[in-house]
Design a protein with these regions (language model features):
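Short extracytoplasmic
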Residues: 34-63
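Peptidyl-prolyl cis-trans isomerase
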Residues: 1-29, 36, 71, 75, ...
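Alpha-helical membrane-embedding segments
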Residues: 62-71
């Protein structure tokens, strides 16, 4: 399938994004606005923590060098982390996760707009997906020794509530269905695929490798 090639173009479009500041933002306050769509601090926090959790739960967390006992705004990506994540500039982990949250919200907004234009609406099958997710989340909360509401705050920040979580899931499920419908609707010839490949070889002709990192000193001579 051509999923890797057909990256949804509108994910990276230039759109009006009002970034939240670093002060404490109350739960109902608009933290980010994307194309006229307002997102609360809790919604921003969800995508921030999603990005954070994906890093700290990855197999390469030891290479990223995140210190969980130090504020993310006080520690920067090391050279290995920048190389692995494709980051070219120096930045703190807090800035990296904020940027990841912004990109997720941009993508979500554009997919929601696409769904609305197509007339795709939330249906019973989508609700079943959400119900399954909520059931799984509740199971993990119990295994960890938390109530569902406490586990939500642990995973996604103190502003997160069950109603906000359900709203986020509804948006993401609808966006996901539209994205898949869009991909499935695309048609292309072998010649078009070949042309695209030839124009973007550097994106596909890459080596697969693993990192082995260790510290040591040279043998004395």
């Amino acid at each position: 399938r051509l999923y890797a090639i057909i990256a949804i173009a509108f994910v990276v479009v230039a759109i009006g994004l009002v970034v939240w500041n670093s002060n404490i933002i109350q739960r109902g306050t608009t933290a980010v606005t994307v194309e006229g769509e307002s997102y609360s601090a809790a919604e921003v926090s969800y995508y921030y923590h999603n990005a954070y959790n994906s890093i700290v739960n990855s197999n390469y967390v030891s290479l990223y060098g995140i210190d969980k006992n130090t504020a993310l705004s006080q520690q920067s990506l090391n050279d290995t982390a920048k190389m692995m994540l494709g980051v070219s500039e120096d930045m703190t982990w807090d800035a990296y996760f904020r940027d990841a949250a912004k990109k997720s919200l941009i993508q979500l907004t554009m997919l929601k707009k696409g769904a609305a234009e197509k007339g795709l609406t939330f249906d019973d099958d989508m609700q079943k997906e959400i119900d399954s997710t909520l059931e799984t989340f509740s199971t993990y909360a119990k295994k960890a020794g938390y109530s569902t509401s406490a586990y939500l705050k642990l995973m996604y920040g103190n502003n997160m509530t069950m109603s906000t979580f359900k709203s986020i899931l509804k948006d993401t499920v609808l966006a996901s269905h539209y994205q898949q419908d869009y991909i499935d609707s695309l048609t292309y010839t072998d010649e078009e695929v070949e042309t695209y490949y030839n124009e973007h070889k550097n994106n596909f002709d890459v080596a697969d490798y693993e990192y082995i990192y260790f510290k040591g000193t040279a043998d004395s001579t």
